Regions:
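Conserved, mostly hydrophobic/aromatic
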Residues: 54, 134, 296, 448
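Surface-exposed binding patches on compact interaction domains or structured appendages
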Residues: 22-37, 49, 59-117
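Secretory targeting and sorting signals
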Residues: 2-24
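An acidic-aromatic substrate-binding cleft motif
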Residues: 143-257, 286, 291-295
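Active-site clefts of carbohydrate-active enzymes
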Residues: 409-441
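Extended acidic/polar, glycine-enriched regions
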Residues: 55-71, 104-163
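Catalytic domains of carbohydrate-active enzymes that cleave complex glycans
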Residues: 278-332, 345-346, 352-359, 453-454, ...
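Noncatalytic carbohydrate-binding groove/subsite architecture in carbohydrate-active enzymes
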Residues: 303, 307-422
């Protein structure tokens, strides 16, 4: 099972494993294993990361965990032990950074310590049960032994560069990450810079997160040439960064919100794009076999006016170069005015419901060169919204009125993705803020699979530290930081509790899509309904909003109720196991 979650959720389901020996200070240390039994149990597919967790209590001093003698070699190679630590977010301490235990081994006081046990299961791992034992010690003296069992199913995760898998695109600023690591380690950029950046992109690839920025690999006006200095060597840096497998490869053209680029290109002058792409960019990408995953993201939420002025000519420019075009926004049609008659006292009364919505059918009419290939739709705008009293009494169903346009664009060949940003109170769908339950990120991945999304985009950043030490404090609600700086210049980036859930959500989305492809959507609905992940009745997803939806909730936009309280992590683990069981026999 996968475990990576908040201390309160973990503490709700624990079984204490008795200590082997008392500690010198007189306290009796113990290791709690969430869930039934005293064994850490992890279910996984080949090519997947999976987490277990334990809570260590009653320990002060130097804490160490290692695999005991006789443990399966796969476990020896795959295990990383991470320690959940706190940072300040919106005025309170929140458990989020996950540095390696070896670099945060000193435990002070008697506060419980949550450890995340991260297993990386290699591709093509044979199905079976891989058993071992975790030995816990304090100041070199053992105090507990805990069995561990990794159960690998006969399921292979999609390749990390498979464009038919669940795709991702996350904005990230490698320059900001590099500066943070250099500040913490005190080394000079010229001696450690390339390695630090390479480890960042390798880490993103392992976690199935495709970068929305290539940083030092961004080409110059003359293309991929190496200028003086490693950070100006565009060809060398892009070859290194792009060598890691990603499902999506964003071409170096920004949106209207992007800072000035060293390419010299602008989102407002798409008439120069085709020549730049075909002459300076695509030959390099073709030589590296990246074109099957290439896309242009050129405008953020254009609306009908900017859609005609910018998104449409951008799409034509991308298509003239032979690459896909993405925009954030939704296929939309204007809802015409309607005259309705409703019961009123002893008689009836007529009302006019005004026309509303903005149409952008010219971007998905299957005519001309300007159709959008990939729509990244804000999750809260996938269905519809609340009904007014007149609409409600007229039996007009507005909770799903946005879906027909999306479904039509999909039927005409468009790929539909999702995107999200900070989920403020009442907006009605999960996001990646540190002030939300960490499980929201994983639930969001399952929702994407449930609604047939082909990918997801995130534009709030992953390493935007705002000049702060992220180990001490995050800006706003933490939504701009999903990765923490490596604690040593030669280390990989430090994960977060939210990023572990995000990665799990991406992997679950891939597994869920496989279940739908092989067994149909009802099979996925049944798995999710059994664990109450979403409001599902029969084969129908029930939506909630303030008025006129299937359910009454506090949200303006229609969205299913989703699980986010105590017990959510355990329920998600059961969903993960059920997905694996739906795809392959249980290993013996």
């Amino acid at each position: 099972m996968r475990r990576a979650l908040h201390l309160l959720a973990l503490a709700a389901l624990v079984v204490t494993v008795s200590a082997r020996a008392p500690v010198a200070e007189g306290a009796t240390p113990a290791v709690d294993v969430p869930g039934p039994g005293s064994t850490v149990r992890v279910d996984a597919a080949a090519g997947e990361f999976e987490n277990g967790s334990v809570i260590v209590r009653g320990v002060s001093g130097h804490l160490a965990v290692r695999l005991g003698a006789g443990s399966a070699p796969l476990l020896q190679d795959a295990l990383s032990v991470l320690r959940l630590t706190d940072t300040q977010v919106a005025g309170r301490a929140i458990g989020d950074p996950l540095p390696p235990l070896t670099q945060r081994a000193t435990v002070t006081g008697h506060r419980p310590v949550t450890l995340v046990l991260r297993f990386r299961v290699p591709d093509a791992t044979p199905p079976g049960i891989y058993a071992g034992r975790l030995d816990f010690s304090r100041n070199g003296h053992g105090f507990a032994r805990v069995p561990v069992r990794l159960r690998v199913f006969g399921v292979q995760m999609p390749a990390r560069d498979d464009p038919t898998a669940f795709r991702t695109l996350f904005l990230i600023q490698p320059q900001t990450y590099l500066a943070a690591v250099l500040t913490g380690s005190g080394i000079e950029p010229q001696s450690g810079g390339p390695g630090i950046v390479d480890r960042l992109y390798a880490f993103l690839s392992e976690y199935r997160v495709s970068p929305g920025d290539w940083g030092f690999g961004t080409p110059w006006p003359e293309g991929y040439v190496d200028r003086t200095g490693w950070f100006r060597a565009a060809a060398t840096r892009m070859a290194a960064e792009g060598a890691y497998p990603f499902t999506a490869m964003r071409l170096p053209l920004g949106t209207q919100r992007s800072p000035a680029s060293r390419t010299g290109q602008s989102a407002r002058t798409p008439e120069t794009w085709t020549a730049y792409l075909t002459g300076q960019v695509l030959p390099f990408w073709r030589d590296h076999d990246w074109l099957d995953r290439a896309l242009v993201w050129g405008w953020d939420e254009p609306g009908p006016v900017y859609g005609r002025q910018y998104a449409a000519p951008q799409a034509c420019a991308a298509h003239a170069a032979g690459v896909a075009y993405l925009t954030t926004g939704a296929p939309a049609q204007r809802i015409p005015a309607r005259r309705v008659t409703i019961p009123w006292g002893q008689g009836t009364r007529s009302f006019t419901i005004r026309a509303h919505g903005t149409g952008n059918g010219f971007l998905w009419d299957d005519r001309g060169c300007d159709d959008v290939d990939i729509w990244a739709v804000l999750s809260r705008r996938v269905y519809g919204s609340f009904a007014t009293p007149v609409e409600h009494r007229s039996h007009i169903d507005v909770q799903r009125e946005l879906r027909p346009a999306i479904d039509t664009a999909r039927a005409r060949g468009a790929s539909i993705w999702s995107f999200t940003y900070e989920s403020k109170a009442g907006l009605g769908s999960p996001g990646y803020a540190a002030t939300e339950p960490a499980t929201d990120a994983r639930v969001f991945g399952l929702w994407n699979a449930l609604e047939g999304m082909d990918g997801t985009l995130y534009a709030d950043g992953m390493v935007s530290y705002g000049g702060l030490d992220p180990y001490k404090r995050l800006t706003q609600h933490g939504q701009h930081v999903l990765i923490y700086p490596a604690l040593a210049s030669t280390d990989e980036p430090v994960s977060s509790l939210r990023l572990e859930n995000l990665r799990d959500g991406i992997e679950d989305a891939d597994l869920a899509r496989l279940v739908v492809a092989r067994r149909g959507r009802p099979a996925l609905l049944a798995i999710l309904a059994r664990q109450r992940i979403f409001s599902i009745r029969g084969n129908r997803v029930l939506l909630g909003c303030t008025s006129g939806c299937d359910l009454v909730t506090k949200t303006k936009y229609a969205w299913p109720r989703y699980r986010h309280g105590a017990g959510t992590n355990a329920a998600l683990e059961r969903v993960h196991s059920a997905l694996l069981k739906a795809l392959a026999p249980v290993p013996a």
